[in-house]
Amino acid sequence: MVTPWRLSVRVCLSHLRCFEFRKELGHSRPLGCSRNARLCWFLLGTLPKLISAHGSVGEGAPGSLCQRKTHWSDLAENGLVEKVAQEGPLARVLLCLRLGLRAGVLLAKFFPLLFLYPLTYLAPGLSTLWLHLLFKATETSGPTYIKLGQWASTRRDLFSEAFCTQFSKLHVQVTPHPWARTEYLLQQAFGEDWGSLLFFETREPVGSGCVAQVYKAFASISLLEEDRIWRLGELSAPGTRAVVMQREPFMKDRKPSENLADEAFLEKLLLPKADLGGSEVGVSQAPWHLPKSDHLIPVAVKVLHPGLLSQVSMDLLLMKIGSKALGLLPGVKWLSLPEIVEEFEKLMVQQTDLRYEAQNLEHFQHNFQDMASVKFPTPLRPLITRDILVETYEESVPVSSYQQAGIPTDLKRKIAQLGINMLLKMIFVDNFVHGDLHPGNILVQGADGVSPSLEMQQQQVNVCDTLVATIAPALCPLRLVLLDAGIVAKLQASDLRNFRAVFQAVVMGQGHRVAELMLHHAQANECRDVERFKAEMATLVTQARKNIVTLEKLHVSSLLSSVFKLLMTHKVKLESNFASIVVAIMVLEGLGRSLDPTLDILEAAKPFLFKGPASFL
């Protein structure tokens, strides 16, 4: 809230705002004035903005210059309605108009499908057509509904197998937003001379999803020691102003903090570069001009689409209203739709704040620091804001490229085994699972350098002295690279024990035990015939293992798919993270068996299930 004295200062000095255009006009100050006079001149034009926009003048002010006035935390904690209510009646009227227009568009797309749904019971072909139309309607309804469709495809305990299979393909390449928007966000986050930090060879993104688009660029290592970079640390962690940075290997000594009492800092902050004739800071380079390559590292720059927060918050508000209305229907009451929307809202909060993804990447790097076969991009912690994520660019090949014919069988088998070991470690050792493990987010490095002698050398190095492996990059070990860590799943300690017990029961063929554990873990259920549910689960597990000589012939993904179908039939609803981890197992096993048909995930899981996670380490 702006206090009266700040308001008076802003009003009295509002005519000085024309100094914003001092660079272009060139006559905002007399030529030839002294250094102190020039500094005072620009302070008069800029200081009122600092005071009116921020609560105080001190060390915190410069760092907060890059922050946006409207934060997602405000929408998440206070709600869109409460926030608009504080802005006056006109804002409320505009919100109602926008909500009405958005609701009208969504009704025009989805209400005819709801009206036609009874026809799907007449013929399987009509059901397939209806699902296709629903897919297209979701695909064109914006990022919130695209993410909702992707998330719903993981809830096989709630939706049919055909629905989940169809919507698991919902990975949309949207039209990228203009370069001008990206340039605006870069300038807002890193200052007008952002071109001295990031260098773009092209303005065209390498990919554009429903939430953000990604550019390939180069980051200057030498300039990461600039004083202003330390102030960017305030934007690098959600909910905190602490500067959390990875200094090594990029930074050595931290320079002292600067504040508004430092005259040199004020001049550097407020004056245009043309006025700093004697300064060591030069004119910023054009974004597409590359200096010497030995001072650069390739990076991926992820930028959120414009207007994303506003659209997502509005769609979530409509979803909450719709879920409460649909929750009154007897047939869907057991789904607890308002709770589902709340779970999805948490997911969208993380998707629309790239600092969460940076935290997840660092968490994964810590978990896999002793496992050279799995790698994650390194977020450049100073260059991270709510809207922009800068991370190392990993030159890799998509894992789907190795599903083709002509790839050596041994290489396919090694890649499949790496993927299964990676997933089992995430689940049973770390309890921190990547929540979006589709083939597009899994890449392969070092496949060209794999040979029997190399593999033997790697094993010897890993056993005797891991430090040797880290200083011998010529070995180029085979490893997986995982991208897009914005969604993760983790279980409570009791839930993890229950999850391990479920897998133990599957291995032992104890169908009744599987049913009991599922019922015990269910978030909500309306199972009216518990004994029948247990009997059908026992039959399901027994039939899956019937006439199977070895467990490697058992397709866990097919078994789990049947389990989900049974859960949906008896209205047993699992906790969302529990379901997400099960789906991750199904996806990885399907991918692994496409590379190695003899892959045995249950055999690989035995050390985790019966000996505990310590046996893996």
Swiss-Prot record:
GO terms for molecular function: ATP binding; protein serine/threonine kinase activity. It holds the Pfam family ABC1. Keywords: ATP-binding, Kinase, Membrane, Mitochondrion, Nucleotide-binding, Serine/threonine-protein kinase, Transferase, Transmembrane, Transmembrane helix. Disruption phenotype: Heterozygous knockout mouse show locomotor dysfunction with increases in plasma lactate and accumulation of organic acids in the urine. They show an unaltered nociceptive information and emotional response. Heterozygous knockout mouse treated with long-term caloric restriction recover overall glucose and lipid homeostasis, have enhanced physical activity, increased mitochondrial function and aerobic metabolism in skeletal muscle. The chain crosses the membrane at residues 103-123. It is a single-pass membrane protein. The lineage of its organism: Eukaryota, Metazoa, Chordata, Craniata, Vertebrata. The active site is at residue 436. Its EC number is 2.7.11.-. Belongs to the protein kinase superfamily. ADCK protein kinase family. InterPro entries: ABC1_dom (IPR004147), ADCK2_dom (IPR044095), ADCK_kinase (IPR052402), Kinase-like_dom_sf (IPR011009). This is Uncharacterized aarF domain-containing protein kinase 2.
